[in-house]
């Protein structure tokens, strides 16, 4: 039990709003529940959520100690009331989440609980699969990341052994990820390979294409194939053979087929015509190739997973379920 004394700066606030600010890790749903159950008292008595606090009031909070910790990335999951996840696949070792555009994988330098990892950790804690108090160091973790404005499949490991294996497999390129994108124009040829060198200006978070090797530029290879075209747009599937920052976006733009909605590498006037504010790019398909031993994850060898829905595929090409798309040749 913790006690809080209402001072001059706190007086006049509603009880629920005051406690919400004083205990930022406490989810709103739990806050309201604890008020109803009288686990939050004012001067020793239960109170309604809209009770106005007065100078000198003493609050008794019968709340678990972890909610009083300082907010940081590692405990941001505590703030999540009802996890918001779209799960593509789940077993005892891994979880594949369909991250929606606009959602951060991790917090961006400031404390934020509206992240994919916080929702996954809250989901597993609420299911009882992850018990933080029984762990010395491990917490469920993401094995790959996707930019905020890009959607798609993100892999989460539920235990340390799965995390180690998946990190190794990603490093050794034994997990294949394919992307859908909507681009301007009709790529010619309709199936091909883009090969050049990419130089990243970290200060500007901008990537530049170089046709020849030069200091700081890294080779980049993307295979693509056009799935269909409609009007001024084409739906393209891309396979990354290297993993460079903004690789698909910058290579497609350099080839003359910028991604719809791409504010950095696309064409502003074209994007305005469609009123798109985020790049039409989605990591929609994932395959565990695993040509070498995968330990406890060997059962995933050869398995492939896809998301069901990609908004721009439905909006511009009438494809409501992208699982129906023809499989790319292996």
Residues covered by each model-derived region:
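RNA pseudouridine synthases
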Residues: 1-330
């Amino acid at each position: 039990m913790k006690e809080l004394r209402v001072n001059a700066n706190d007086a006049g606030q509603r009880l629920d709003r005051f406690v919400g600010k004083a205990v930022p890790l406490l989810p709103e749903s739990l806050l309201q529940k604890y008020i109803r159950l009288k686990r939050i008292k004012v001067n020793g008595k239960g109170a309604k959520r809209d009770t106005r606090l007065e100078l000198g009031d003493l609050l008794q909070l019968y709340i678990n100690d972890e909610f009083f910790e300082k907010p940081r990335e590692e405990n941001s999951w505590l703030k999540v009331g009802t996890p918001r996840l779209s799960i593509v696949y789940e077993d005892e070792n891994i979880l594949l989440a369909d991250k929606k555009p606009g959602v951060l994988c991790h917090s961006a330098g400031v404390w934020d609980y509206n992240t994919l990892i916080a929702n996954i950790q809250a989901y597993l804690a609420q299911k009882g699969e992850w018990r933080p108090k029984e762990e010395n160091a491990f917490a469920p973790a993401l094995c790959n990341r996707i930019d905020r404005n890009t959607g798609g499949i993100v892999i989460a490991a539920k235990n340390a052994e799965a995390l180690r294996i998946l990190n190794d497999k990603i490093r050794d390129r034994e997990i294949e990820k394919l992307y859908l994108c909507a681009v301007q124009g009709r790529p010619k040829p309709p199936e091909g390979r883009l090969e050049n060198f990419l130089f990243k200006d970290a200060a500007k978070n901008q990537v530049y294409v170089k046709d020849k090797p030069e200091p700081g530029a890294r080779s980049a290879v993307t295979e693509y194939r056009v799935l269909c075209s409609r009007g001024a747009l084409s739906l393209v599937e891309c396979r990354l053979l290297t993993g460079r920052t903004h690789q698909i976006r910058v290579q497609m733009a350099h080839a003359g087929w910028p991604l719809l909605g791409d504010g950095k590498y696309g064409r502003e006037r074209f994007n305005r015509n469609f009123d798109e504010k985020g790049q039409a790019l989605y990591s929609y398909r994932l395959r565990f190739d695993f040509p070498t031993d995968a330990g406890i994850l060997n059962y995933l060898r050869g398995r492939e997973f896809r998301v069901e829905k990609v908004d721009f595929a439905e909006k511009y090409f009438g494809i409501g379920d992208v699982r129906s798309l023809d499989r790319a040749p292996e």
